[in-house]
């Protein structure tokens, strides 16, 4: 069996694809896996690092909304679809599993031409254009939110890295806090703005950090590799404020934390919900408002707070985040609400949907 994954561009498209690849290999170590990608996407680094085959096709960016530019897409897609067809034929693909992004639509259209079953996973609450189109031809459609508008969709959550899906935060906490140089007992705020949205969060956290420390809160702050590291003057006897350029073991960061201040990308929301980590979500104010939609269900369930980017200030953090961190019972209740909303088994559920699509083709 050979499965082609179509989900390049950003980590939000690539990580669920790689989680599925890992799950497929756990079930059948002999399964062939090829990921479609473009030269400009993160997949050029992430896919080979995980040991999977990467096949490149030309990038055809899709507009987020219907615009006059949309008319030019079919012409630009032709060569890309042909390249995708050649990859499907070369690998003798049994299924194409798409996650959105630049490479998804060419992958779907190539699969449709060749009669290869299509399985779609949509991570965002508001589906992207590629998955809207691809869902018309798909044998199976999986979504991350229970109220998705994609027809025939099955709610499974988002496939997660195994280190996240199996994380026991309480059991790993002593090791995690020691790894980051944190106090083993103090309430801990984790801060990360992701690859795109760190600057605003960085500014606010650097301003509010002394007030949090005075209140007995320690901070682990992933500043972002492209951002300037803050100058920290640690006062004796104060809880630590630890800025780092990047965290490559997010499972340890989640285990070390009691709460997180972060953006609301679909993958972030899914991971925090799965591990039961309460968060103050600050949706990135770009696109179609999908980040706000991503966070709303878990916030409504009681597992987080939600604040617009323009309203995020040091005063807001003091008035809203600090009271949560200072209240163990409220932290417990928010953690329980988040974990009840989260899903840890989406990778295995999606594997089942891939097998169903392949089996239906041969009936």
From Swiss-Prot:
SUPFAM superfamilies: UDP-Glycosyltransferase/glycogen phosphorylase (SSF53756). Coiled coil: none annotated. Keywords: Cell cycle, Cell division, Cell membrane, Cell shape, Cell wall biogenesis/degradation, Glycosyltransferase, Membrane, Peptidoglycan synthesis, Transferase. The keyword Transferase applies. One of its GO terms (molecular function) is UDP-N-acetyl-D-glucosamine:N-acetylmuramoyl-L-alanyl-D-glutamyl-meso-2,6-diaminopimelyl-D-alanyl-D-alanine-diphosphoundecaprenol 4-beta-N-acetylglucosaminlytransferase activity. The keyword Nucleotide-binding does not apply. GO terms for cellular component: plasma membrane. It comes from the Bacteria. InterPro entries: GlcNAc_MurG, Glyco_trans_28_C, GlycoTrans_28_N. Belongs to the glycosyltransferase 28 family. MurG subfamily. Cell wall formation. Catalyzes the transfer of a GlcNAc subunit on undecaprenyl-pyrophosphoryl-MurNAc-pentapeptide (lipid intermediate I) to form undecaprenyl-pyrophosphoryl-MurNAc-(pentapeptide)GlcNAc (lipid intermediate II). PANTHER family: GLYCOSYLTRANSFERASE (PTHR21015:SF22), UDP-N-ACETYLGLUCOSAMINE--N-ACETYLMURAMYL-(PENTAPEPTIDE) PYROPHOSPHORYL-UNDECAPRENOL N-ACETYLGLUCOSAMINE TRANSFERASE 1 (PTHR21015). UDP-N-acetyl-alpha-D-glucosamine binds at residues 10-12, 124, 161, 195, 291. GO terms for biological process: carbohydrate metabolic process; cell division; cell wall organization; lipid glycosylation; peptidoglycan biosynthetic process; regulation of cell shape. Pathway: Cell wall biogenesis; peptidoglycan biosynthesis. This is UDP-N-acetylglucosamine--N-acetylmuramyl-(pentapeptide) pyrophosphoryl-undecaprenol N-acetylglucosamine transferase. It is an enzyme of class 2 (transferase). It is found in: Cell membrane. Transmembrane segments: none annotated. Its EC number is 2.4.1.227.
């Amino acid at each position: 069996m050979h499965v082609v994954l179509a989900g390049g561009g950003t980590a939000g498209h690539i990580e669920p694809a790689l989680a599925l690849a890992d799950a497929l290999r756990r079930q059948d170590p002999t399964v062939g896996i090829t990921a479609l990608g473009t030269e400009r996407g993160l997949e050029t680094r992430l896919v080979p690092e995980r040991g999977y085959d990467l096949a490149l096709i030309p990038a055809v960016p899709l507009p987020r909304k219907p615009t006059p530019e949309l008319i030019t897409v079919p012409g630009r897609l032709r060569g890309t679809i042909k390249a995708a067809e050649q990859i499907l034929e070369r690998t003798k693909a049994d299924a194409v599993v798409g996650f959105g992004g630049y490479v998804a639509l060419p992958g779907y259209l190539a699969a449709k031409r060749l009669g290869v079953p299509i399985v779609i996973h949509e991570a965002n609450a508001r589906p992207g254009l590629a998955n809207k189109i691809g869902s018309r031809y798909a044998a199976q459609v999986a979504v991350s939110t229970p109220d998705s508008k994609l027809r025939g969709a099955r709610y499974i959550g988002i496939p997660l890295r195994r280190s996240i899906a199996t994380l026991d935060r309480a059991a790993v906490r002593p090791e995690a806090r020691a790894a980051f140089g944190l106090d083993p007992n103090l309430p801990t705020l984790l801060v990360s703005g992701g690859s795109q949205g760190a600057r605003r969060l960085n500014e606010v956290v650097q301003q509010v950090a002394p007030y949090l420390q005075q209140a007995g809160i320690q901070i682990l702050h992933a500043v972002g590799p492209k951002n300037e590291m803050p100058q920290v003057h640690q006062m004796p006897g104060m809880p630590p404020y630890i800025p780092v350029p990047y965290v490559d073991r997010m499972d340890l960061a989640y285990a070390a934390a009691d709460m997180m201040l972060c953006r609301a990308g679909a993958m972030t929301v899914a991971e925090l919900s799965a591990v039961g980590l309460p968060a103050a979500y600050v949706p990135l104010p770009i696109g179609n408002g999908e980040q706000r939609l991503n966070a709303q269900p878990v916030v409504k369930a009681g597992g987080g707070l939600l604040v617009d980017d323009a309203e995020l200030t040091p005063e807001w953090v003091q008035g809203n985040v600090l009271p949560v961190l200072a209240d163990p019972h409220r932290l417990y209740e928010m953690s329980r609400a988040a974990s009840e909303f989260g899903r840890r088994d989406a990778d295995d559920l999606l594997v089942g949907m891939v097998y169903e699509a392949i089996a239906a083709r041969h009936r």
